[in-house]
C-alpha cells in the first residue's frame, strides 16, 4: 500500500491547459494583482480532473496516507489554485517552482517531499507514488526512484507525440480516472507490466495481462513498428540508481546475463504472451491439416559467444511437453532461423549509439535458410531491447524472405538516463 502520494498539478489535479501563459508569467511573483488574475481565470470554467471528494476518500480509506503536490508551476499560482480547488485538503507537502534547485525531470522534489513527511530512507521508495500526466513526471519518478502512475484523464482523444512518448516510457501504472488512482494507491502491483508483476508480487495478472506495445522506428523513417515488452530494464546509470536498487526485473536480467537455465517466471511470461497474443489463432478451427503453425525463434548470439537464448528457447519448448501446441496452434521452435556474420559488434559493450546500432545489425544479421521461411508465421524473442534495431531487422529480413507475419517480443525494454535528453 502507498504511504505517500505526490500529485502533479496542471493536467493532473486540475485542467488548466488554457492558463499556460498566465502560469508561466507568475515565476517569482507574489503580488495580489497576479493572484487575482489566476483566481478569475481558474473560476471561469470547471477545472477538476481529480475532485476534492476523491482526495478526502483517499485519506479516509487509506490509513496514514500522506498527500503532496510536486509541480513546476510558480508558488503564488499554486497556492491560489490549491486554495480554490481543494479548500478542505491539508496537504502534507507542496513543492513549487521556487522550492527546488533542480526541476522535473529531476526527482529532487520527490526526495524533499519524502523528508517532509518523515520518510528519510531510500528503502521507503517503493511506498511512494508520483501521479502525473506526462513524460517529465515519469522521468522525475524514475530519477527519484519511486513508483509512477501516468494519469490520462486530461488527455485529448487523439494522442500527440508527447502522449505516445509518455506511454513509451512504460510507467508502473497507467490510469484513466480518479477511481483508478484510488485502486492503484491501495495496491500498485496489479497494473505492472506482466513479468514485473510476476517477479514482485509472485502471481500473474488476474485480468488482462499487460504487454506494452512500444513503437520503434528505423532511422529517418516514419513507419511505426511494434515491439511487445513484458517489463523494464533500468540501466546502471547514476540517474537511475535508486529505482534500480529495488527493481526485481532489472536484477533478474543482470543475474541471468550469462545463464543457460532461466527463471521460471521468464518462461511463464513468454507462454502467457503467446496465449494472449495469438488467442484467435488458438481457437479457430483449421480448414484442413493439423492447425496453424507458429515458428518461435530468438535473436542469435554473436559468432564468438554462446547462444544463451537458444537455451531459453529450449526451456520454453520443454514447458509445452512432447507435443508443443496451444489448442489448435502448432508451436515449432528453431533457435537457428537467424544468424550473425563475423565482425558484428556488441551493441552494449561497444557503447554503440542509435544509428551505429542499426547499421551494425543491418550489415551483419541474416536469415540462415530463406527457403524455409516462405509463408510461415514467426515470433522473434529477445531478452532486452533498447533501440529495437535487432528485432526490427529480424522482422524486415524474415518478411523479405517471404514470412507471412512476424511479431517481435522482448522480456524487457531498456530505460535509459531520464536526465540525459531534456
PLM regions and their residue ranges:
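Substrate-recognition "cap/lid" segment bordering the active-site pocket of phosphatases
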Residues: 75-129, 135
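A short, structured active-site edge motif that brings together acidic residues
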Residues: 89-105, 297-301, 327-344
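PRPP-dependent phosphoribosyltransferase catalytic core
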Residues: 163-165, 170, 176-229, 392-422
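Short, acidic loop-to-helix structural element flanking the phosphoryl-transfer center
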Residues: 33, 39-69, 75-79, 107, ...
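Active-site-facing substrate-recognition patch
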Residues: 199-291, 311, 338-370, 416
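PRPP/pyrophosphate-binding module of the type I phosphoribosyltransferase fold
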Residues: 139, 143-148, 155, 340-422
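Acidic, Mg2+-coordinating phosphoryl-transfer loop and its flanking beta/alpha structural elements
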Residues: 130-173
Amino acid at each position: 500500500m502507498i504511504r505517500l502520494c505526490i500529485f502533479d498539478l496542471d493536467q493532473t489535479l486540475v485542467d488548466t491547459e488554457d492558463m499556460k501563459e498566465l502560469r508561466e508569467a507568475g515565476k517569482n511573483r507574489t503580488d495580489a494583482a497576479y493572484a487575482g488574475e489566476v483566481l478569475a481565470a481558474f473560476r471561469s470554467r470547471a477545472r477538476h480532473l481529480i475532485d476534492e471528494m476523491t482526495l478526502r476518500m483517499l485519506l479516509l480509506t487509506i490509513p496514514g496516507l500522506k498527500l503532496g503536490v510536486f509541480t513546476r508551476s510558480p508558488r503564488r499560482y499554486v497556492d491560489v489554485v490549491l486554495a480554490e480547488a481543494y479548500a478542505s485538503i491539508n496537504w502534507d507537502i507542496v513543492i513549487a517552482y521556487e522550492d527546488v534547485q533542480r526541476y522535473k525531470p529531476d526527482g529532487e522534489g520527490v526526495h524533499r517531499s519524502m523528508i517532509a513527511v518523515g520518510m528519510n530512507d531510500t528503502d521507503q521508495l517503493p511506498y511512494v507514488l508520483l501521479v502525473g500526466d506526462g513524460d517529465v513526471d515519469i522521468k522525475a519518478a524514475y530519477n527519484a526512484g519511486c513508483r509512477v502512475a501516468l494519469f490520462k484523464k486530461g488527455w485529448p482523444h487523439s494522442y500527440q507525440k508527447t502522449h505516445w512518448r509518455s506511454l513509451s516510457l512504460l510507467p508502473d501504472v497507467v490510469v484513466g480516472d480518479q477511481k483508478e488512482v484510488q485502486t492503484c494507491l491501495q495496491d500498485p502491483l496489479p497494473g505492472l507490466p506482466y513479468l514485473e508483476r510476476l517477479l514482485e508480487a509472485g502471481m500473474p495478472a488476474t485480468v488482462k495481462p499487460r504487454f506494452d506495445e512500444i513503437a520503434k522506428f528505423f532511422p529517418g523513417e516514419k513507419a511505426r513498428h511494434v515491439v511487445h515488452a513484458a517489463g523494464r530494464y533500468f540501466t546502471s546509470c547514476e540517474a537511475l540508481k535508486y529505482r534500480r536498487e529495488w527493481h526485481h526485473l532489472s536484477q533478474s536480467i543482470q543475474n541471468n546475463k550469462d545463464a543457460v537455465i532461466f527463471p521460471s517466471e521468464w518462461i511463464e511470461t513468454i507462454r502467457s504472451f503467446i496465449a494472449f497474443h495469438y488467442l484467435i489463432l488458438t481457437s479457430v478451427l483449421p480448414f484442413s491439416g493439423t492447425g496453424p503453425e507458429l515458428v518461435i525463434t530468438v535473436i542469435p548470439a554473436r559468432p564468438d559467444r554462446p547462444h544463451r537464448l537458444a537455451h531459453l528457447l529450449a526451456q520454453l519448448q520443454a514447458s509445452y511437453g512432447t507435443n508443443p501446441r496451444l489448442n489448435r496452434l502448432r508451436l515449432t521452435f528453431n533457435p537457428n532461423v537467424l544468424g550473425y556474420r563475423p565482425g558484428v559488434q556488441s551493441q552494449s559493450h561497444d557503447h554503440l549509439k542509435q544509428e551505429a546500432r542499426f547499421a551494425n545489425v543491418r550489415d551483419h544479421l541474416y536469415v540462415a535458410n530463406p527457403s524455409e521461411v516462405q509463408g510461415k508465421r514467426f515470433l522473434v524473442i529477445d531478452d532486452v531491447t533498447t533501440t529495437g534495431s535487432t528485432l526490427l531487422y529480424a522482422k524486415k529480413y524474415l518478411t523479405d524472405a517471404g514470412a507471412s507475419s512476424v511479431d517481435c517480443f522482448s522480456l524487457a525494454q531498456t530505460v535509459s538516463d531520464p536526465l540525459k535528453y531534456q
